[in-house]
Every structure is written in C-alpha cells, then in structure tokens.
Amino acid sequence: MLTSLITSSTTVTLTLSQIYYILDIACGFLISVLVWMNSSVLDNGNHSNPQIRDMSSNMIKADCVVIEDSFRGFPTEYFCTSPRYDECLDYVLIPNGMIKDRLEKMSMDIVDYYEACNATSITLMCVLKGGFKFLADLVDGLERTVRARGIVLPMSVEFVRVKSYVNDVSIHEPILTGLGDPSEYKDKNVLVVEDIIDTGKTITKLISHLDSLSTKSVKVASLLVKRTSPRNDYRPDVGFEVPNRFVVGYALDYNDNFRDLHHICVINEVGQKKFSVPCTSKPV
C-alpha cells in the first residue's frame, strides 16, 4: 500500500515502511529531549560539560550521551515488549528510536576520524553475541555516511566471541574465541564493535591481543559504557554512559535471554530469578 503526501506543487509518494522510519526518527528525537530534561544531562553548575569525555589512545572523539543515576526510565507499558518478559523488566532505559539517532552521529564521527587519518579501509570486529545488532545498525550508518560524502572507504567484518558473564556476575577471566588467522589483521585499521563496557577487562584483553598482531591501529566503538565502582577508566568512542545497573535488550542478554527486546531495558529481580542458571565460573 502506498500513501501520498500532497504539497502545494508536487506529490511525494512514500511507502509505509518509509513513513514508519520517519515516525521512528521523530519519536527518537522527542524521547531524546525527554531524557535530557529528566536526567539533567547538560551542565547543571556542578560539572564542566559532563558529556565531553577525555580521549584515550584507543578512542575516536565523540560526544557521549550521559544518562544520570537519578533517571528512572520510561514505563514498559508504553512500549512494545514480548509477553515472555512481562513482570521481568524494571523500566525502559533507552528506547530504540533514541539508539538509532545516536548511532547516526556516531557513524559520522567514526568516518570523520578515519578520513582524517587517511585510512584506506576499516576492519570492523564485532564482539559476539551482544554486539550483532549494534554492528548491523552501525555499518548501515557508516555506509550511508560514506555514500553521502562520495568517498571510498571499504569495510570488512570479522567476529570474535566473548563470554564474560554468568547471571549478573562478571567471571574472573573473559573467554575469547574465533579470532581466526592472526595474519589477517596485519597492517589493518581495526574497529572493535562492542555492546557494553563494564569492568573493562574484556576489551582490555582483546585490545592487547590485537596489538600483538601488528595491526596498524585498534579503536573501539561501544554502544554503552557503564559507570562502575571502582570506576572503569577505559573510554572508547561511546554512544551512552549508563548507570551501574544490569541492562538487557537490543541484543544485550541475561543468560541468552532478552536479546530480542527492541529497546534497552533494566532487568528486575523477578527477571533475574526467572532466567538464572547455575553459576560454575569463578566471579571477579
């Protein structure tokens, strides 16, 4: 079915999927404003611009959306979630439309960085399983940015699998598998695509390993970074800084559940108990 929008001089025809996409972006913008108003992201007189974070050697310069500890999210009944997770979620922390809007800007920042470095190609390394949705949407944004600018920046994708949690407990030593032939990374610009950085142990281990493979550069783009105590000092290019709560959805999981949620949500005690498994790994 097609819907026509009539202007004074022309007729613009959009498919329903295009209309839904426009509405999704508009909703994301409105929700972004609500988050800003509720969480006091902007300078409140107590900090000097908390959105701008110091850059480490493995960081691509980008602003960070900070969701404060005082922000209590959005009621789940206002969003589409699976009946399987009824009573398992505390609230929606980041709606999907807001995620998509943030990734558009991250994509432009990343292309800016590699253009400035005169990079001839990028190898994106997705950290599975939680990073696959972030990767798909990020690559889509990168490709749109490259096309719009009329530049040549070939991209390839590799995958590495990491296990770092059992239930809500970070295990003592993250397990990395699937890196493949080490020679494939020699003299490559590697962009690690991670879903969330918590303690920083997993990403630090992965960067150290990649550095040993004679890569040209190793950078990290993470959808989320969690405010932990003691504070995790590793600062990648990041979409959102979030409170130290266990988050699920948008491919982030709790024992391989909740990956199918459209939004990023905070799991509650009922959900943790319902989907818990016996813990055999040594905690941190």
Curated annotation (Swiss-Prot):
Named cofactor requirement(s): Mg(2+)
Example GO molecular function: magnesium ion binding
Keyword Nucleotide-binding belongs to the record: yes
UniProt remark on cofactor binding: Binds 2 magnesium ions per subunit. The magnesium ions are essentially bound to the substrate and have few direct interactions with the protein.
Positions with a binding annotation for GMP: 129, 194-202, 226, 253
Entry annotation: catalytic residues: 198 (proton acceptor)
Organism the protein comes from: Schistosoma mansoni
Catalytic activity: IMP + diphosphate = hypoxanthine + 5-phospho-alpha-D-ribose 1-diphosphate; GMP + diphosphate = guanine + 5-phospho-alpha-D-ribose 1-diphosphate
Documented EC number(s): 2.4.2.8
PROSITE patterns recorded: PUR_PYR_PR_TRANSFER
GO aspect biological process, one term: purine ribonucleoside salvage
Amino-acid positions noted as binding Mg(2+) in the UniProt annotation, renumbered to this chain: 253
Family: Belongs to the purine/pyrimidine phosphoribosyltransferase family.
Compartments where found: Cytoplasm
Keywords: Cytoplasm, Glycosyltransferase, Magnesium, Metal-binding, Nucleotide-binding, Purine salvage, Transferase
Function: Converts guanine to guanosine monophosphate, and hypoxanthine to inosine monophosphate. Transfers the 5-phosphoribosyl group from 5-phosphoribosylpyrophosphate onto the purine. Plays a central role in the generation of purine nucleotides through the purine salvage pathway.
Pathway involvement of the protein, from the record: Purine metabolism; IMP biosynthesis via salvage pathway; IMP from hypoxanthine: step 1/1
GO terms for cellular component: cytosol
Protein name: Hypoxanthine-guanine phosphoribosyltransferase
Cross-referenced InterPro entries: HGPRT, Hxn_phspho_trans, PRibTrfase_dom, PRTase-like
Quaternary structure note: Homotetramer.
